[in-house]
């Protein structure tokens, strides 16, 4: 499946792991992904130390989380706020099939990278946006991470924390980011198919909050249907159905 998107060009303007991981998946499927970074240090994920594990102490002298979200890409540092940088960026967009970003609506507005502005460079480009809380509502311009928007606000921590425990469930690194990135990459693939069939380039929006809500959809539905707090949290060995009990092996 490594050549499914051969010939597709993606311009990514995104940082950390959520949206970049979507770009990595598109690269895995054969797309040519160009990651645009600023000229003052690039993606801050380059400097992330997870669990106190420094990249220079690893066997390969590399940042594991940065590699997960950015493997298979080409990288280019551009100051898109300068006239020269904007010209270069515009040429990249003009040649691309997909623009992938995690910039918030207000950031895109200030940078003159709104949908209308991007479509002046390329009217057929698919625009894919990933955010913390989505593109609408009072929190659209508030930043979000998977630990807050996905695990906390969406209720994932509540669903996974046993009753009577003092502290909520703690996710591992990029737990919600990678799920959200997979969904966003799938949305881009569907948009490419739609454009091929209907000659229309759609906008793809995803958020960590929406991804988290989908992850706990059974709890939400059961809470609505039965007026409770969601799927019962049985202790090990107590579930009424032995098939779903947990057993020590």
Description of each model-found segment:
Residues 82, 101-160:
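N-terminal Rossmann-like NAD(P) cofactor-binding subdomain of oxidoreductases
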Residues 11, 57-120:
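A structured beta-alpha segment of the ubiquitous adenosine-cofactor-binding alpha/beta core
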Residues 31-75:
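Glycine-rich phosphate-binding loop and adjoining beta1-alpha1-beta2 segment
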Residues 34-36, 76-78, 126-128, 204:
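Hydrophobic/aromatic beta-strand patches that form the interior of the parallel beta-sheet core
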Residues 41, 53-57, 136, 148-249:
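Acidic, glycine-rich segments within the central catalytic cores of soluble metabolic enzymes
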Residues 2-42:
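Conserved small-residue-rich beta-alpha loop and adjacent elements
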Residues 10, 26, 73, 100, ...:
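Structural scaffold positions in well-ordered secondary structure
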């Amino acid at each position: 499946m490594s050549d499914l998107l051969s010939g597709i060009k993606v311009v990514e303007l995104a940082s950390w792991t959520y949206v970049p991981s979507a770009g990595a998946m598109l690269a895995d499927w054969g797309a040519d992904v160009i990651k645009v970074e600023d000229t003052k240090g690039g993606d801050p994920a380059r400097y992330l130390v997870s669990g106190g594990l420094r990249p220079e102490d690893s066997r390969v002298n590399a940042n594991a989380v940065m590699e997960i979200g950015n493997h298979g890409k080409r990288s280019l540092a551009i100051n898109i706020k300068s006239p020269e940088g904007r010209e270069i960026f515009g040429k990249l967009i003009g040649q691309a099939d997909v623009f992938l970003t995690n910039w918030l609506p207000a950031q895109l507005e200030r940078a003159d990278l709104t949908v209308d502005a991007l479509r002046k460079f390329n009217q057929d480009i698919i625009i894919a946006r990933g955010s913390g809380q989505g593109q609408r509502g009072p929190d659209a311009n508030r930043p979000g991470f998977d630990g807050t928007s996905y695990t906390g606000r969406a209720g994932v921590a509540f669903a996974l924390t046993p009753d009577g425990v003092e502290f909520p469930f703690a996710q591992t690194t990029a737990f919600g980011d990678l799920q959200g990135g997979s969904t966003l990459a799938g949305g881009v693939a569907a948009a490419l198919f739609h454009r091929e069939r209907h000659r229309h380039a759609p906008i793809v929006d995803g958020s960590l909050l929406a991804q988290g809500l989908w992850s706990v959809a059974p709890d939400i539905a059961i809470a609505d249907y039965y007026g409770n707090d969601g799927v019962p949290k049985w202790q090990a060995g107590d579930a009424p159905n032995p098939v779903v009990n947990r057993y020590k092996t």
